[in-house]
Curated annotation (Swiss-Prot):
Family annotation (InterPro entries): PTAC12 (IPR034581)
Regions of compositional bias (Acidic residues) in chain numbering: 471-480, 490-502
GO molecular function, one term: transcription regulator activator activity
Compositional bias ranges of the Basic and acidic residues kind: 521-538
Gene: PTAC12
One GO cellular component, as annotated: chloroplast stroma
Keyword set includes Iron: no
Known role: Required for the activity of the plastid-encoded RNA polymerase (PEP) and full expression of genes transcribed by PEP. Required for the proper build-up and formation of the PEP-complex. Binds single-stranded (ss) DNA and RNA, but not double-stranded (ds) DNA.
Keywords from the named record: Chloroplast, Nucleus, Plastid, Transcription, Transcription regulation, Transit peptide
Protein name per UniProt: Protein PLASTID TRANSCRIPTIONALLY ACTIVE 12, chloroplastic
Residues annotated as transit peptide in the record: 1-58
Keyword hit for Methyltransferase: no
Compartments in which it is found: Plastid, Chloroplast stroma; Nucleus
Domain of life: Eukaryota
Length: 555
């Protein structure tokens, strides 16, 4: 190894002996001490680190210094007993459960390094202030360190004339940075967290206890609840004649609506108007479902507090005005010797069958909802109906009663089907139907023109194509020759007969046209071939062959 000798700055009064060997700058061989020695001198603090002249450092190779490898502290253990697998596991290596450092996830190395940090060295000279004066003991030292780093190696200007310039040499800049880091890390300032004063609502919300949906301190006041007529969702179209508003305008009493109204009467919820809307009924149903267990627990606590006689006397009309407190029961026990159970049985002997059904419901094993147990008789009938044998509550008794079906959905009453269809012309009476049929029959009789019967029935028969095309053309030539030989009067009669046969043939082929129009199509008047032009001949001819034949004849 090589041991280094740091030349220190020469102060007045120190010896200036030069050691053997080439030294370019005046140096003083002393043992290496920290630069903090001079910072501890109050009258020398201002002169520290102000010199700019640097000296050459003498390094001497010394092989006498060596280290013993056995002095290196081994790891605390090479294997450990893993509680998960129940076997000895190596602490390092390929089979180790803990992987090497290069495989650690992000942030693990920093946490391990922080856990291995040594305790701060040194002893505190002052008394702790417990956070009242944070950092006061280190304030001067921090300023000095920052000034030292800022003016590192600077030359002093306040030296006397003729004196040698003072020299300040620092081993390295990294040491100064490490000292600054150490000074920052060694002292931790603890700030006591401010305790939040939670309101009752915030505390209930944080602990999960039942609490309102909106903070009561921040909730807006809704004012007085409006009546049913003032609420916008009960609006209805004004009728032409003033009519009495019927009870059928309300929603039909079902379980949710009746329970919502009962909950509003007992103060569990608040509804706007005389009757709950669909939304309010749905919300009340949800609330009733969620908090039923809590209500049952509250009822059980009440039963234990006031005693069973006072609790169950609510459903015994004969005991309404009787004192059922624990003191009265104890007094009765002292007088007669009847304990609480005997008095309870005696009370239930005065209970009617109807009161028992209300109290227990249909099944004694069912834990009844206390709200349902305390509902009025009319509310219970609205939900479950009255007597199932002779129903009196959920049915309309008068068969001629006109029911107003207008409900909160704002649709108009369902009209009668027959008058509605007759009004829109979809349905007509039987008399109107017969009248229209007679009119149509007369119109058909007037429009149809009867065709005289042909003498020869075969003349009206449709030619299915017995002859070939050449034979037909030969027959036509013969007809032309015959026509030329006949006189004019006979020709006219034959033309008329041909026209009638042609009309009859068209009627047989297309009877629907005659039925719809009522008139047979008249045959086109054939002009004489001498007067036909080329265009008319093309239009008149049925196909190209006929046109060419006609064209040859005209030429």
């Amino acid at each position: 190894m090589a041991s280094c000798y740091n030349p220190w700055r020469l102060f007045p009064g120190m010896s200036t002996a030069v050691p053997a060997g080439p030294v370019t700058a005046p140096a003083h061989s002393r043992t290496c001490k920290s630069s903090k020695v001079f910072s501890a001198l109050p009258h020398r603090r201002g002169l520290l680190f102000l010199g700019t002249r640097r000296a050459r450092i003498k390094c001497v190779k010394d092989d006498s210094l060596h280290f013993d490898p056995s002095k290196i502290e081994p790891p605390p253990y090479s294997s450990y007993f893993d509680s998960t697998s129940g076997q000895l596991e190596p602490a390092s290596g390929a089979r180790a459960s803990i992987p090497g450092k290069e495989y650690w996830p992000e942030g693990t190395a920093a946490r391990v390094r922080a856990a291995r940090a040594p305790a701060p060295v040194g002893e505190s000279a002052g008394m702790p202030s417990f956070g009242t004066k944070p950092g006061s003991r280190r304030r001067g030292y921090k300023e000095q360190v920052t000034s030292a780093s800022g003016t590192e190696g600077a030359q002093t200007d306040d030296r006397k004339d003729g004196d040698e310039p003072d020299v300040a040499i620092i081993g390295s800049g990294d040491d100064a940075l490490e000292e600054i880091k150490d000074s920052v890390d060694e002292y931790v300032i603890y700030e006591t967290p401010e305790e939040e004063e939670l309101s009752e609502y915030d505390m209930d919300k944080m602990m999960g206890r039942p609490h309102p949906f909106i903070d009561p301190a921040k909730a807006m006041s809704l004012g007085e609840p409006k009546t049913s007529e003032e609420l916008w969702w009960h609006w209805r179209r004004k009728s032409q004649e003033e009519e009495m508003w019927s009870r059928w305008q309300r929603r039909r009493p079902d379980v949710d609506t009746v329970f919502a109204k009962a909950m509003a009467e007992t103060g569990q919820i608040k509804i706007f108007g005389d009757h709950p809307s669909r939304t309010e009924a749905a919300l009340a149903k949800t609330r009733r479902h969620l908090y039923k267990e809590e209500r049952l627990e509250a009822e059980q606590r009440r039963l234990e507090e006031i005693g069973p006689i006072a609790y169950y006397s609510e459903w015994v009309e004969a005991y309404k005005n009787k004192d059922t407190s624990r003191e009265a029961i104890q007094k009765h026990f002292e007088e007669t010797g009847e304990d609480e159970n005997v008095q309870l049985i005696k009370m239930f002997q005065h209970q009617t069958a109807g009161e028992y059904r209300i109290m227990m419901g249909t099944d004694v094993r069912i834990q009844r909802d206390p709200l349902a147990m305390r509902m009025r008789e009319d509310q219970i009938k609205q939900i479950w109906g009255g007597d199932p044998v002779y129903p009196t509550i959920n049915y309309v008794q008068d068969p001629d009663e006109v029911i107003d079906y207008r409900g909160p959905e704002f649709h108009e009453p369902t009209p009668e089907v027959v008058p509605y269809l007759m009004e829109h012309g979809i349905m007509i009476t039987k008399e109107e139907l017969y009248a229209r049929l007679n009119e149509e029959r007369e119109d058909v009789n007037q429009d149809i023109t009867y065709i005289p019967e042909a003498k020869d029935p075969m003349a009206t028969a449709i030619d299915i194509g017995e002859h070939s095309y050449n034979e037909d053309s030969d027959d036509e030539d013969e007809d032309v020759d015959k026509a030329a030989a006949q006189p004019q009067s006979l020709e006219d009669e034959e033309d008329d007969r041909d026209d009638v046969a042609e009309v009859e043939e068209k009627v047989n082929q297309n009877w629907s046209a005659l039925k719809s129009t009522g008139q047979a199509e008249k045959p086109k008047e054939k002009s004489k071939k001498d007067e036909m032009t080329l265009k008319e001949a093309i239009d008149d001819s049925e196909n190209l062959t006929d046109f060419l034949m006609d064209f040859e004849e005209t030429e």
